[in-house]
């Protein structure tokens, strides 16, 4: 990709984030085009893509036959098909799996590294972009297209925008915002996704979890009314038979080192510590606080105390901005 990522700065929590423009280099774009695009995606992902309008984007899962997620996808309509954003570390294997049945359909599935992914968040993000685009997305219309640019709106943890655009527009936006906005890399966007409770599936956790173990049902990413798709039987069983015993949690606190994706944590049990959970993502903020996204049992006590393995510091549960009640 010719557009150079911005240098990293320590990320900031959403409540204190100044206006910030981010390069989302740890995320990647992919597309499906062709006459059978909608039908094909409908048979592959957990969401009901046939009901998606041009104004919507949503988080869906692409599962294996056992209902375990290869990846989750931030999906939106694009040209005569769809585009999606996922972690760069899982894009190649996810596309390999998605293409397995494509020979029988009129579709072209491909990575897209021509376009650039940017994020805008922080203080008065909307006002900063209002000078640069004729229309901005909102709750009512979450996707807006203008020329070569697609803008996606996010409500949590605070209003922010994901911009999919060409290199020329990315350079223009950088030049226009450089004076007033801080520049940062994708760690800041990752910190915001963790705060928002959006599950982050990197390569270490691909093929490990059913969608409900990462709260996808609470984020509107699973349709239980649509026709069949790969892994549907297991995903449905988890709902209707109560087979899912896990959930995604947000922990904050201190740690002398950041846990890596796929690592477990330790839960305090009286005087002892017991291993628990699987870390999806973790970030250290500029104030020294550590935020961790972890899949654990869904019946954790809200006052539970955790730590990174053998660490002297502790982590506690923070509420997510959505409810898991069905």
Curated annotation (Swiss-Prot):
Subcellular location: Cytoplasm
Main localization (coarse): cytoplasm
GO molecular function, a single term: folic acid binding
Binding site for folate: 27, 189
UniProtKB keywords: Cytoplasm, Folate-binding, tRNA processing
Entry GO CC: cytoplasm
GO BP term, example: tRNA processing
Protein purpose: Folate-binding protein involved in regulating the level of ATP-DnaA and in the modification of some tRNAs. It is probably a key factor in regulatory networks that act via tRNA modification, such as initiation of chromosomal replication.
Family under the similarity heading: Belongs to the tRNA-modifying YgfZ family.
PANTHER family according to UniProt: TRANSFERASE CAF17, MITOCHONDRIAL-RELATED
Protein name stated in the entry: tRNA-modifying protein YgfZ
Origin species: Escherichia coli O6:K15:H31 (strain 536 / UPEC)
Lineage per the UniProt record: Bacteria, Pseudomonadati, Pseudomonadota, Gammaproteobacteria, Enterobacterales
């Amino acid at each position: 990709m010719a557009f150079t990522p911005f240098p990293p700065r320590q990320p900031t929590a959403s409540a204190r984030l100044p206006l910030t423009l981010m390069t989302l280099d740890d995320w990647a774009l992919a597309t499906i085009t062709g006459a059978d695009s909608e039908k094909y995606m409908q048979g592959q992902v957990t969401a009901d893509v046939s009901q998606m309008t041009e104004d919507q984007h949503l988080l869906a899962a692409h599962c294996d036959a056992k209902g375990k997620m290869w990846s989750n996808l931030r999906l939106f309509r694009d040209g005569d098909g769809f585009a999606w954003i996922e972690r760069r570390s899982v894009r190649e294997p996810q596309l390999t799996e998605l293409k397995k049945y494509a020979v029988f359909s009129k579709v072209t599935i491909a990575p897209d590294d021509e376009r650039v992914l940017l994020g805008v968040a922080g203080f008065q993000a909307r006002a900063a972009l209002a000078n640069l685009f004729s229309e901005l997305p909102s709750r009512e219309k979450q996707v807006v297209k203008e020329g070569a640019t697609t803008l996606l709106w996010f409500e949590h943890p605070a209003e922010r925008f994901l911009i999919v655009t060409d290199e020329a527009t990315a350079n223009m936006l950088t030049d226009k915002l450089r004076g007033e906005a801080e520049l940062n890399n994708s760690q800041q966007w990752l910190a915001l996704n963790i705060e928002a409770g959006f599950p982050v599936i990197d390569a270490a956790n691909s093929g490990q979890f059913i969608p409900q173990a990462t709260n996808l049902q609470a984020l509107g990413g699973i349709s239980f009314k649509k026709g069949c798709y790969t892994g549907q039987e297991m995903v449905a069983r988890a709902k209707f038979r109560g087979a899912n015993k896990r959930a995604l949690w947000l922990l904050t606190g201190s740690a002398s080192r950041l846990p890596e994706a796929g690592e477990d944590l330790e839960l305090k049990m009286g005087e002892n510590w017991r291993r628990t959970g699987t870390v999806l993502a973790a970030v250290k903020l500029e104030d020294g606080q550590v935020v961790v996204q972890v899949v654990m049992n869904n019946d954790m006590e809200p006052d539970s105390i955790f730590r990174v393995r053998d660490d002297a510091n502790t982590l506690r549960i923070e509420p997510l901005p959505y409810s898991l009640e069905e």
